[in-house]
A protein has these predicted regions:
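Amphipathic alpha-helical repeat scaffolds of TPR domains
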Residues: 10-15, 43-57, 81-103, 133-145
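Short coil/linker segments at helix-helix boundaries
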Residues: 57-78, 88-123, 148-162
Length: 181
């Protein structure tokens, strides 16, 4: 038997979208992801499928690398609406931070991410469609999460890198470097 993906019909896309939503509700993001890929194979610019695919990837975040962040970001950035691009970028950042909280990442490492998510939500709020308060709801969730974390200060690194800096391994390979002795 030949293993070859089958292409769904464009007429079947609305039902396939419903199945994606169902599998997300059932907490089966891999199933939802597979269907999103099938929809996009039939209609590569389908905005709902792009949104849902990005969301199914964020549903799989566990707070460790690799978490498919860049892949989800690519799908969200391909949305045509400026509002959607800002809103879903904020949601992407927020969901990654929440996954990292659950994975035990120190709170001070997440403050910057949550502030960046809030910046996205604030910009999205300015251009939101009428009667759409989603960006404000997400902003409020970030505020509550920061309050729960105690709003720790962002840890500042005193290390600065410059264009001419060399990786430590390269220094060790140079004559007179530690490895050369």
């Amino acid at each position: 038997m030949e293993l070859k993906l089958k292409t769904i019909s464009k007429d079947g896309i609305p039902e396939a979208i419903s199945k994606v939503e169902l599998y997300r509700y059932l907490n089966e993001p891999e199933e939802a992801e597979s269907i999103c890929h099938d929809i996009l194979a039939a209609d590569p610019d389908n905005q709902m499928a792009l949104r849902l695919l990005g969301l199914t990837l964020t549903d799989q975040f566990e707070g460790r690398h690799p978490d498919r962040y860049a892949e989800a970001e690519k799908f969200f950035q391909s949305l045509t609406s400026p509002y959607d691009r800002l809103y879903y970028r904020g949601l992407l950042i927020e969901r990654r931070a929440k996954a990292q909280v659950k994975a035990g990442v120190p709170a001070h490492n997440l403050v910057g991410s949550l502030h960046e998510a809030m910046r996205c939500f604030e910009e999205a709020e300015k251009i939101r469609p009428p009667h759409n308060d989603d960006a404000m709801l997400r902003w409020n969730r970030c505020v509550r999460l920061l309050e729960k974390l105690g709003n720790p200060p962002v840890e500042q690194s005193h290390t600065s890198l410059h264009d001419d800096d060399t990786a430590p391994i390269e220094i060790m390979r140079r004559p007179g470097g530690r490895a050369a002795k």
